[in-house]
């Protein structure tokens, strides 16, 4: 391999201007993502705003229904991954080779670890909306389709998928919306402390 053949390197072994530009752009993007991490409500309000703008655009243009359907299916897939545990309890239950000694109590606190964390869910959902928005600028994605059929398909798919997910939650007794172990507080001490 001769000098400058590797990706992003110029003839003199230094990174090329284009490579440095995109590296810097990626760093700025990651910095903004890192800064937005603690602001959960603000992030979701912005995403809902983008979603609203997208829906208004589709309504006014009277097209791109197949893109909207694909976006809905993508968001449903993300939501199911968000509600699902990282380790599927049905796989752990089926791995029994025979009788074994109990290793933990049923009531032991086990934190719910999601398959798709909230931040990644938000990030993927927002990127999906932006990609769908970009698709509405190209007529190639405006496939003529009878939109009530797509709405019916989506509602059926949503109901079937959520029914299966709720049955899974009930069967394996997990709730994806807990905020941690319950903390019990003692009685408030109303007496004054005495200094000796």
From Swiss-Prot:
Keywords, comma-separated and alphabetical: Acetylation, Golgi apparatus, Membrane, Phosphoprotein, Transmembrane, Transmembrane helix
Q: How does it sit in the membrane?
A: Multi-pass membrane protein
Is Transferase one of the keywords?
no
Provide the protein's localization.
Golgi apparatus membrane
Primary localization: Golgi
Write out the GO MF terms: acetylcholine receptor binding
Record has Heme as a keyword: no
Give the intrachain disulfide bonds: none
Q: Name one GO biological process term.
A: positive regulation of protein localization to plasma membrane
Q: Which GO terms describe its cellular component?
A: cell surface; endoplasmic reticulum; endoplasmic reticulum-Golgi intermediate compartment; Golgi apparatus; Golgi membrane; plasma membrane
Q: Which residues carry this modification: Phosphoserine?
A: 2, 6, 10, 95
InterPro entries hit by this protein: Rer1 (IPR004932)
Q: Give the transmembrane region(s).
A: 41-61, 63-83, 140-160
Kindly list the positions at which N-acetylserine occurs in this protein. Answer: 2
Any Pfam family matching the protein: Rer1
Q: Which family does it belong to?
A: Belongs to the RER1 family.
Function, as annotated, reads: Involved in the retrieval of endoplasmic reticulum membrane proteins from the early Golgi compartment.
PANTHER family, per database record: PROTEIN RER1
Name of the protein this chain belongs to: Protein RER1
Give the source lineage, highest ranks first. Eukaryota, Metazoa, Chordata, Craniata, Vertebrata
* Gene behind this protein: RER1
